[in-house]
Each structure stands twice: as C-alpha cells, then as structure tokens.
C-alpha cells in the first residue's frame, strides 16, 4: 500500500509542475526584456572611462555626455576629471606622456579590481620605458590585431552607392616624409628606387610641408604612393597606407609588416608589397611597365568598399566601452614590454 505521507498525489504533482513552469517563464521574460519585477525596464548602466591625460594635448577636447553616441557606442562616458578615479569603470593612460614623464600614474590608492588600460598607436621602435610598467596594466589598446581593444588606423567598410571616379594621373610615384633618417630602411629603399624611376617627394623633410587636405589632393595625381612605414613591426599599418594612398586614390607600394598582415585588412590586389621583389630595380621595372588595364585592377576594391579612418582619440577611447563586456577580468600584463616587442 502506498504511503500518502511520502509521495504527493498525481494531481498535486501536476499543479506543482505548472506553478514552477509559470515562475520560470516569468523569470526568463524579465531577463530577456531587462525588466525589474515591478514591470519597469531595468536601467542599463553607463560605463565611465577616465582618460588620465589626453594624448598629445595639454588641453583635452570637450567631452559632452553624448560623445560616444556619435561613434555608435551607447551608455559610455568619457571624462578627464581625475576626482572620479575611485568610481571609474576603467582608467586609460596614453604611453607617450608616461614615456616623456609629462604625466605620471595616480598617487592615490588604486581602487580594488579597477582595470587600467595602456594605450599607444606608436611602433615598438618609438616606444620606451615599458620595463617599469610591469604588472600595472590589465588591457591594451593599440593597432595590434591581438590587442584587447583593437583600434586600427583605418579599415575598409562596405560601400553604399557607386565609387567616385578615379583621379586623373599626371605623375608616377609620390612620397610624403617628415622624418628622413639615413639609417631607416625606407630611406635606403627610396634612394635605390630613385635611381630607376622618378619619385616626387613632399613633406617637411623635403621642404614642402602639406596640410592634410593638401596631401590628399597632391597624392591623387600620382599612380603610386610609397607607403613606407618608419619601422617594421607586427600589424603596424598606419595612415600612410589608409589615408595617404587608398583614400587619396593611389596604389600603395608598401614597406612594413609582411604581406600577410596587409592581406588581413585589405584585398591582396589593392597594394604592391616591396618584399615581392628581389631588388629595387625589379620593383621599379614592375611599376614603370604596368599597363593601364593591370593598373586599374588595383582599384577593383573601390567598387565594394570605402576607406574609414580612425584618427580621433575620442572614438578610439569609446572603443573601450564597445568591448567592455567581453574584456578579460583579472588579466595583468606582467611583461608588457615583452608582449609589445614580440
């Protein structure tokens, strides 16, 4: 005989199951809609990013509450108010000011669990003082594709509408350079190329400085642009590629990381890589002998994509908020220098 005190009747079991199902459905609905038990939508928290010192500027720009909304990032607040250190969700430090000691790390006690972000868009060759920053930073914001917050100098995005016509060409190759040092590989390669083809040089080093818009207009009249980076490092592809060449409407002749790094961010037929040639003479012969049909193929990407630049530090810092939910908690860069030099 069944003991009624130990086992509920079938009807009671059914009622209990229905009640539990209703409760679970309600909880699931609250979770999906972000609603509080009272029915009102649960407020979404705003992420506050404290910029400890603004890059390259003694006076930071205006940072209204909707700054990041302009870049498609909601519920993100940028501030330079250091009194908010204790309550900031993350604090970001631009390395150049730490390197030159124009700025220092906070003297106040670091809030427990607060992530600190190391930010730099410079190459390792122009970065010093990382050794004293062991165990300080949790996240990295840089051009490196393996950064916690990856911020490229530019990227290709789907184009809406037809591409603008290609600018008329009157010259073969151009180069804009401000820092001209004989020991740099780019200077050595330029001098070798100049023995075999004409390269028109602009910029401070040539005594012909150009404003940003002037640069684009000047380069647009050339078939090729020497997108030579000042140093060769992993993923270091700067505005020399994105703005000075692709945006201007010239085919970039690139000197920088290996071809694979460029192919990770642009079509393989959108640029000429110097490493594909055994000598400067071979490269010069390739450029000077290219017919119009072959040349036009280097612009096939323009039918599908447009260039978007990321040059505004406000947008770069807003990217921290965009990545914030996915960023690794508890991570510490014990050897930031070793990571960055790799």
Swiss-Prot record:
InterPro entries: Glyco_tran_10_C (IPR055270), Glyco_tran_10_N (IPR031481), Glyco_trans_10 (IPR001503), GT10-like_C_sf (IPR038577). GO terms for biological process: fucosylation; inflammatory response; leukocyte migration involved in inflammatory response; lymphocyte migration into lymph node; positive regulation of cell adhesion; positive regulation of cell-cell adhesion; positive regulation of leukocyte adhesion to vascular endothelial cell; positive regulation of leukocyte tethering or rolling. Inhibited by NaCl. Inhibited by GDP in a concentration dependent manner, with an IC(50) value of 93 uM. Also inhibited by GMP and GTP. Inhibited by N-ethylmaleimide. Activated by poly(ethylene glycol) by enhancing the thermal stability of FUT7. Activated by Mn2+, Ca2+, and Mg2+. Both panosialin A and B inhibit activity with IC(50) values of 4.8 and 5.3 ug/ml, respectively. Inhibited by gallic acid (GA) and (-)-epigallocatechin gallate (EGCG) in a time-dependent and irreversible manner with IC(50) values of 60 and 700 nM, respectively. N-glycosylated. Expressed in thymus, spleen, liver and lung. Highly expressed in the thymus and lower expressed in the lung. The chain crosses the membrane at residues 12-31. Pathway: Protein modification; protein glycosylation. Glycans are attached at residues 81, 291. It catalyses: an N-acetyl-alpha-neuraminyl-(2->3)-beta-D-galactosyl-(1->4)-N-acetyl-beta-D-glucosaminyl derivative + GDP-beta-L-fucose = an alpha-Neu5Ac-(2->3)-beta-D-Gal-(1->4)-[alpha-L-Fuc-(1->3)]-beta-D-GlcNAc derivative + GDP + H(+); a neolactoside IV(3)-alpha-NeuAc-nLc4Cer + GDP-beta-L-fucose = a neolactoside IV(3)-alpha-NeuNAc,III(3)-alpha-Fuc-nLc4Cer + GDP + H(+); a neolactoside VI(3)-alpha-NeuNAc-nLc6Cer + GDP-beta-L-fucose = a neolactoside VI(3)-alpha-NeuAc,V(3)-alphaFuc-nLc6Cer + GDP + H(+); an alpha-Neu5Ac-(2->3)-beta-D-Gal-(1->4)-beta-D-GlcNAc-(1->3)-beta-D-Gal-(1->4)-[alpha-L-Fuc-(1->3)]-beta-D-GlcNAc derivative + GDP-beta-L-fucose = an alpha-Neu5Ac-(2->3)-beta-D-Gal-(1->4)-[alpha-L-Fuc-(1->3)]-beta-D-GlcNAc-(1->3)-beta-D-Gal-(1->4)-[alpha-L-Fuc-(1->3)]-beta-D-GlcNAc derivative + GDP + H(+). Keywords: Disulfide bond, Glycoprotein, Glycosyltransferase, Membrane, Signal-anchor, Transferase, Transmembrane, Transmembrane helix. Residues 1-11 are cytoplasmic. The keyword Nucleotide-binding does not apply. GO terms for cellular component: membrane. It is an enzyme of class 2 (transferase). It is found in: Membrane. Catalyzes the transfer of L-fucose, from a guanosine diphosphate-beta-L-fucose, to the N-acetyl glucosamine (GlcNAc) of a distal alpha2,3 sialylated lactosamine unit of a glycoprotein or a glycolipid-linked sialopolylactosamines chain through an alpha-1,3 glycosidic linkage and participates in the final fucosylation step in the biosynthesis of the sialyl Lewis X (sLe(x)), a carbohydrate involved in cell and matrix adhesion during leukocyte trafficking and fertilization. Belongs to the glycosyltransferase 10 family. This is Alpha-(1,3)-fucosyltransferase 7. It comes from Bos taurus. The gene is FUT7.
